[in-house]
Each structure stands twice: as structure tokens, then as C-alpha cells.
Curated annotation (Swiss-Prot):
Domain of life assignment: Eukaryota
Keyword line: Cytoplasm, Nucleus, Oxidoreductase, Phosphoprotein
GO cellular component terms given for this protein: cytoplasm; nucleus
Job of this protein: Functions as an intracellular leucine sensor that negatively regulates the TORC1 signaling pathway through the GATOR complex. In absence of leucine, binds the GATOR subcomplex GATOR2 and prevents TORC1 signaling. Binding of leucine to SESN2 disrupts its interaction with GATOR2 thereby activating the TORC1 signaling pathway. This stress-inducible metabolic regulator may also play a role in protection against oxidative and genotoxic stresses.
Pfam family, one: PA26
Quaternary data: Interacts with the GATOR2 complex which is composed of MIOS, SEC13, SEH1L, WDR24 and WDR59; the interaction is negatively regulated by leucine. Interacts with RRAGA, RRAGB, RRAGC and RRAGD; may function as a guanine nucleotide dissociation inhibitor for RRAGs and regulate them. Interacts with KEAP1, RBX1 and SQSTM1; in the SQSTM1-dependent autophagic degradation of KEAP1. May interact with PRDX1.
Name of this protein: Sestrin-1
One GO MF term: L-leucine binding
Catalytic reactions on record: a hydroperoxide + L-cysteinyl-[protein] = S-hydroxy-L-cysteinyl-[protein] + an alcohol
GO biological-process terms attached to the record: cellular oxidant detoxification; cellular response to amino acid starvation; cellular response to L-leucine; cellular response to leucine starvation; negative regulation of TORC1 signaling; positive regulation of macroautophagy; reactive oxygen species metabolic process; regulation of response to reactive oxygen species
Taxonomic path: Eukaryota, Metazoa, Chordata, Craniata, Vertebrata
């Protein structure tokens, strides 16, 4: 448990202890410090997300008793409530599983020492230029006794961690290229070799933070107050709210419209939702009437896989990584490339041959006990999570839509389900949504607020956060499948 030992350390947490216990006004003792001449940082920006109005997050967080308990547990474990946690407030069942899994990976007994875990988190987040996560884990790395020299660049870290850089690179951007030779190179590196258990722990951490970078960018997570870009020393503007309002129930605010795009007319919103629901009804009727042959199903997968290569955004420009992030990884020019372009041919990964439930789960649990179960629970919650709503409609079965989103992501990675009709994807996911999905999953550093607002314009922010949970868990599972299959092939 991390406890603040000095006044200035208390301010490094986005939510200080006094705030957690229910301060009624911003300050928590800060006014007294300002009288003493101490410069106190104030949040820069409007709430935990640049995409989601702060008032919506405040209202949800203050009305749910379960969230209060989760916040308290998270604060006790990490000494902070970060903005990712605050945005996940919309989905408490998932958040509980997420926090439990992350706590186990970072703090409970395991093959890797604590400072290695945070450094691997830094390496993984840096591949997507996610300074938000890098900054969080730099602080945690130092807190658990990590050597500050390692933070000057990957070349200053132990050779064992440097050797992990290649796997990190390929796993983050082109996981279909991972082979058993990558695994062998790490396990047989003489005095710098990894054990199988250590490697599985590292792989889980890498996939966790690659995916969390996707969530960070996909939801427009704002920098923490103690990080670069997250604070100012200027006097506050007139406002009645601070982050502590989440825990003390002080939310006497005007109701925010549930429509995430204010410029969309009510009639446009209505017809977009109705059109999507009608497509779902038609597809269900087609399922009941006829079933496509295996050959036709395979053909539709190949068509969707090829089409996914040509889904890109108009903002698809290269993003040059900043030095403070790029020093944590090598080969800065290496990034996502569609797996079938440039004459490359990669065999389709058939889930019937190697899947998480029958193969990956047991391998992880054998080498890193209990983690497989935690990850499996998180996958299932994200995949099955539903409130049976779509925008303004209730009592809607959204399973078809959730499956289309999950399988589209796996399709982009070359992963095929023999029992799924990939023709449904084009019926349910329009181009703007596909652009958002592909950007969040493959090049999250390029996500813009315009992309977030352009898909499902009539849906609530909570529903868009739900989409992001599906995206990150599907991505994590895809990466794990390729990495764990390579480990299995090495072992056999």
C-alpha cells in the first residue's frame, strides 16, 4: 500500500486522501499552503477526459455506492485514482475486474520483481507514444526502488530488458509476425535469459499496456495533475467543481444531454439508430432462414480481411514520438502495417486450431498461476457486458453487434472464427466506425476527438466507453493468441 508521507507527495495523486474522505470544496488544506507561499498546481483541462463532459462522469461516480468502494480500494492500493479509473466509472462490473487484474499483475507475488513490472509497462506504453501511461509508471517505478538511470533510455536498462524490446515492438504493431524464434532468443540468452514464467508475466504486461494505451487515446484521457500538461499554477477560473465531487456527491449540476454530438439533429439521431436496429433484425431473420456453407464463410472472411486494409483515416499522418517517450524503446520507425500488403502472405490464424479458452488460458495459468483466470474473467465481462440498450431504445439484444465488433478486430489481425459469417460486419459497422476501431486498435496515438464524435453520433458516452472496452480486450486477446501460440510451439 502506498501512503503519502509528506504534504507534497499527497499532491502527486489526482485524488488526495482528504479529497477521498469527502472535501466539500476544492482545497483539502491547500488554502493554508498557499498562505505559506507554496505554489499549488491546479488541474489543466476539464475533467478526466477530453472527449467526455466532466459533469457526466461526476454524476455517475457520485451516485453509485459500488463505485465508492472501488475508488477506496483503488486509492488504498495505488495511492491515487487515475483518470482511466474515473472514465471506467460508467461500467463498475468491468472496472472491478480490471482493477483486480492490474493489481495482481503489478503488486502481487509473481515471477518478475516489482520494478521490472513497471519498466515493462513503460516500454509497452512508449511504443504507442502514450506519455500518460509512461508518466504514471515512471513514478511507480521510482517508488518501488527502480534505478533512475534506466529512465534515461532503454540502452541504460539491463540487457535482459533490452532483449525484450524486439518482442515488444512486434507484439505492439505486427503480432502476426511473432515466431517461436523470438521466444527462443529470449529463453536462451545465456546470462540474460528469461525463464518461461518470467516471459509469460512479461507478455501479459506488454499486452495489457498496449491495450491500455488504446483505451487512453480512444477515450481522450487527460494528463494527471502531477504530470506534464496536466497542471497550471494560475489562479482558478470561477467553477463549482473539482475532482473530489465524484466521491462527496456534490453534483448539483445541470443535466447534460445524452447525445454525444450536439450538432446532430434529433431526427438524424433517430433514423441512424433505427437503421442499425433494422439491419440487426434483418440479419437475424437471414440466420434463421439459411446458413452459409463453410466455403462461403471462408470467402467472406478473406473479403473482409482484405477490405480492412483499406480502412484508414484522413488524419493518417505519421506521428513523431517525443524524446521523453521514444527513449524507452528502439526502432522508432517501426509501426503498424497491414499484414497482407507489400506482397506479404501470412496464413490465417484459425481459432479452431488455437484459442484462448482451450490453449492460452491453461498455458498462462500453468506458468503464472491465477492470472489466466483473472484475464479470462475480464475478457468475458467485456464481451458479455450489456444493459440491453441502444441510444434511446431499451430491451435490445446487442449480442450480434458486440460479436461483430470483436470479430472485426480479430479479422484485422488475421484471426478467423469458422462459425462466424463475416458478411455481417459490413452490415453493422459503417465506415466511420471502422476508421475509429482500426485507429484505436492499431495506431491509437492518431485518435482524434473528431473520430470519437463521428461514429455512433446518437449514442451515449457510456456506450462509447463500452465500445472501447470491447476494443482493448479484443486487441489484448489477439496479441496474447499470437504470443502464446509461439511459446507453445517452442515448448513442443
Amino acid at each position: 500500500m502506498r501512503l503519502a508521507t509528506a504534504a507534497n507527495e499527497a499532491y502527486t495523486a489526482p485524488l488526495a486522501v482528504s479529497e477521498l474522505l469527502g472535501c466539500k470544496q476544492c482545497g483539502g488544506g491547500r488554502d493554508h499552503d498557499e498562505e505559506l507561499g507554496i505554489r499549488i498546481p491546479r488541474p489543466l483541462g476539464q475533467g478526466p477526459s477530453r472527449f467526455i463532459p466532466e459533469k457526466e462522469i461526476l454524476q455517475v461516480g457520485s451516485e453509485d455506492a459500488q463505485m465508492h468502494a472501488l475508488f477506496a480500494d483503488s486509492f488504498a492500493a495505488l495511492g491515487r485514482l487515475d483518470n482511466i479509473t474515473l472514465v471506467m466509472v460508467f461500467h463498475p462490473q468491468y472496472l472491478e475486474s480490471f482493477l483486480k487484474t492490474q493489481h495482481y499483475l503489478l503488486q502481487m507475488d509473481g515471477p518478475l520483481p516489482l520494478h521490472y513490472r513497471h519498466y515493462i509497462g513503460i516500454m509497452a506504453a512508449a511504443r504507442h507514444q502514450c506519455s500518460y501511461l509512461v508518466n504514471l509508471h515512471v513514478n511507480d517505478f521510482l517508488h518501488v526502488g527502480g534505478d533512475p538511470k534506466w529512465l534515461n533510455g532503454l540502452e541504460n536498462a539491463p540487457q535482459k530488458l533490452q532483449n525484450l524490446g524486439e518482442l515488444n515492438k512486434v507484439l505492439a504493431h505486427r503480432p502476426w509476425l511473432i515466431t517461436k524464434e523470438h521466444i527462443e532468443g529470449l529463453l536462451k540468452a545465456e546470462e540474460h535469459s528469461w525463464s518461461l514464467a518470467e516471459l509469460v508475466h512479461a507478455v501479459v504486461l506488454l499486452t495489457h499496456y498496449h491495450s491500455l494505451a488504446s483505451f487512453t487515446f480512444g477515450c481522450g484521457i487527460s494528463p494527471e495533475i502531477h504530470c506534464d500538461g496536466g497542471h497550471t499554477f494560475r489562479p482558478p477560473s470561477v467553477s463549482n467543481y473539482c475532482i473530489c465531487d465524484i466521491t462527496n456527491g456534490n453534483h448539483s449540476v445541470d443535466e447534460m444531454p445524452v447525445n454525444s454530438a450536439e450538432n446532430v439533429s434529433v431526427s438524424d439521431s433517430f433514423f441512424e439508430v433505427e437503421a442499425l436496429m433494422e439491419k440487426m433484425r434483418q440479419l437475424q431473420e437471414c440466420r434463421d432462414e439459411e446458413e452459409a456453407s463453410q466455403e462461403e464463410m471462408a470467402s467472406r472472411f478473406e473479403i473482409e480481411k482484405r477490405e480492412s486494409m483499406f480502412v484508414f483515416s484522413s488524419d493518417d499522418d505519421e506521428v513523431t514520438p517525443a524524446r521523453d517517450v521514444s527513449r524507452h524503446f528502439e526502432d522508432t520507425s517501426y509501426g503498424y502495417k497491414d499484414f497482407s500488403r507489400h506482397g506479404m502472405h501470412v496464413p490465417t490464424f484459425r481459432v479452431q486450431d488455437y484459442c484462448w479458452e482451450d490453449h492460452g488460458y491453461s498455458l498462462v495459468n500453468r506458468l503464472y498461476p491465477d492470472v489466466g483466470q483473472l484475464i479470462d474473467e475480464k475478457f468475458h465481462i467485456a464481451y458479455n457486458l450489456t444493459y440491453n440498450t441502444m441510444a434511446m431504445h431499451k430491451d435490445v439484444d446487442t449480442s450480434m453487434l458486440r460479436r461483430a465488433i470483436w470479430n472485426y478486430i480479430h479479422c484485422m489481425f488475421g484471426i478467423r472464427y469458422d462459425d462466424y459469417d463475416y458478411g455481417e460486419i459490413n452490415q453493422l459497422l459503417d465506415r466511420s466506425f471502422k476508421v475509429y476501431i482500426k485507429t484505436v486498435v492499431c495506431t491509437p496515438e492518431k485518435v482524434t476527438k473528431r473520430m470519437y464524435e463521428s461514429f455512433w453520433r446518437q449514442f451515449k458516452h457510456s456506450e462509447k466507453v463500452h465500445v472501447n472496452l470491447l476494443l482493448i480486450e479484443a486487441r489484448m486477446q489477439a496479441e496474447l493468441l499470437y504470443a502464446l501460440r509461439a511459446i507453445t510451439r517452442y515448448m513442443t
